[in-house]
Amino acid sequence: MATLCLFDMDGTLTAPRQKITEEMDGFLQKLRQKTKIGVVGGSDFEKLQEQLGNDVVEKYDYVFPENGLVAYKDGKLLCKQNIQGHLGEDVIQDLINYCLSYIANIKLPKKRGTFIEFRNGMLNVSPIGRSCSQEERIEFYELDKKEHIRQKFVADLRKEFAGKGLTFSIGGQISIDVFPEGWDKRYCLRHLEHAGYKTIYFFGDKTMPGGNDHEIFTDPRTVGYTVTAPEDTRRICEGLFP
């Protein structure tokens, strides 16, 4: 019976929004000789490629962009799901309008562009804007740790859209993921149900309640590990697969 190591990307395999290091990339290819490996991220496929390499689908047995709403196995596309068909245009517009008006009322040291990114399986909402520089990203993240900007935004969204079948979770350093209930990272597990794995190990950094790794981390189908950085991920894997 085979095992699978399933990794979050940002903060687990790479530094947030940075490319994977050669050392980590090489380590994972060695690990692949001992176990199947997969990556699951909230980001879209292009961002996974940017960070893990254009050949990501050849390097991992499973690649699950957008929490597995887009799924690749052994280099081939398995399926693609979309949010607009599921929620309907009215709910999506209400959500976008509400988020833009909320962001317009927050005073931050800096605001940039791309406050909402529309993906296949989710909306990604960023108070500072996704086009901020790396320095601006870190500045916002440090401020957010003190002032809980995203936490308050999420609490507000949960109240405003209660009963609409939506989940709001804090993702990465600068944004909030919004998706239908059940479309969190656990969604990718449905592609693995009949694959016959004895154990699915999951590694992620945002495993606390409200973090976008929490649901899959606590799911009974996985054995979850909380990591703090790629080095930590490597250390745990070396312990599991000496």
Swiss-Prot record:
Mg(2+) 1 binds at residues 8, 10, 205. GO terms for molecular function: metal ion binding; phosphomannomutase activity. It catalyses: alpha-D-mannose 1-phosphate = D-mannose 6-phosphate. InterPro entries: HAD-like_sf, HAD-SF_hydro_IIB, HAD_sf, PMM, PMM_cap. Pathway: Nucleotide-sugar biosynthesis; GDP-alpha-D-mannose biosynthesis; alpha-D-mannose 1-phosphate from D-fructose 6-phosphate: step 2/2. Its main location: cytoplasm. Its EC number is 5.4.2.8. Keywords: Acetylation, Cytoplasm, Isomerase, Magnesium, Metal-binding. Mg(2+) 2 binds at residues 217, 219, 222. Involved in the synthesis of the GDP-mannose and dolichol-phosphate-mannose required for a number of critical mannosyl transfer reactions. PANTHER family: PHOSPHOMANNOMUTASE (PTHR10466), PHOSPHOMANNOMUTASE 2 (PTHR10466:SF2). Belongs to the eukaryotic PMM family. This is Phosphomannomutase 2. It comes from Mus musculus (Mouse). The gene is Pmm2.
